[in-house]
Amino acid sequence: MSSVNPVAAVEIEGLTVGVAARTLVRGLSMRIRAGEAWCVLGSNGAGKTTLLHTLVGLHRAAAGSIRLWAKPLADWSIEDAARIRGFLPQFIHDTFGASVLDLVLMGRHPHLSRWHWEGAADRELARAALEALGLAHLAERDITTLSGGERQRVAIAALLAQAPAILLLDEPITHLDLHHQIVVLQHLSALARDQGKAVIFSIHDLNLARRFATHALILMDDGIVRHGPAGEVMNAPVLSAAFGYPVLEMQAGERTIFIAE
């Protein structure tokens, strides 16, 4: 297991985020450290995607600050930021065909010197990412021939090949069957636990979130955010309030599960 860096991977102070006249996050202050896997929970329209976009730098906060490894987000160059943090968007659009391997190799571009092509080490990392997600047999397939679930896993593989210290993923298990949902979340959890990555992902499945996340950030009404260790903040009263529907908490052996009433 990797040692924990005393400096927070992501440090948020007084963050307020909104869209139009609506405040989604109000005055959020928190730290995300290396070795932690955070799930972002909330109802549709609560602001999960907007918050992730803000942490990446794609959406301007109304107030507050974000630091990556103690350095203000705005002070990172595009090139340097791409080396230390990676982002998987919720929607992916392909405008042209390419092989699966070539697309995953695109994740290595931030690490290449100008005018240099990918080398053997880059190809090894790309193939390892495909292998980790059960995609090695599709390496030479054209991405336009893939199913939605296969294409989603290829996008995640490209993020893995990028090898950032901070991974932000917007609904990474969308389009995936149960088996591949587990494979992806197991791998993300292992990246945090074994390699000291900071992992932040939005998700709708409460039980998978509770199983694989070490910490949870829950978007409530009126910009209120609950955050902390998943076992503490993920409980029936909080989740019922967040989703506007009664949620029951039960035990299945040593595992906590949530069901709708």
PLM regions with names:
Residues 41-43:
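The feature captures the beta-strand-to-loop junction immediately N-terminal to the Walker
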Residues 56:
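Helix-to-loop junction immediately C-terminal to a conserved catalytic motif
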Residues 105, 120-138:
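Conserved ABC ATPase "signature" region
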Residues 142-146, 150:
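Conserved ABC ATPase signature
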Residues 167-171:
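Catalytic Walker B motif of ABC-type/P-loop ATPase nucleotide-binding domains
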Residues 216-229:
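H-loop (His-switch) and adjacent beta-strand-loop-beta switch element
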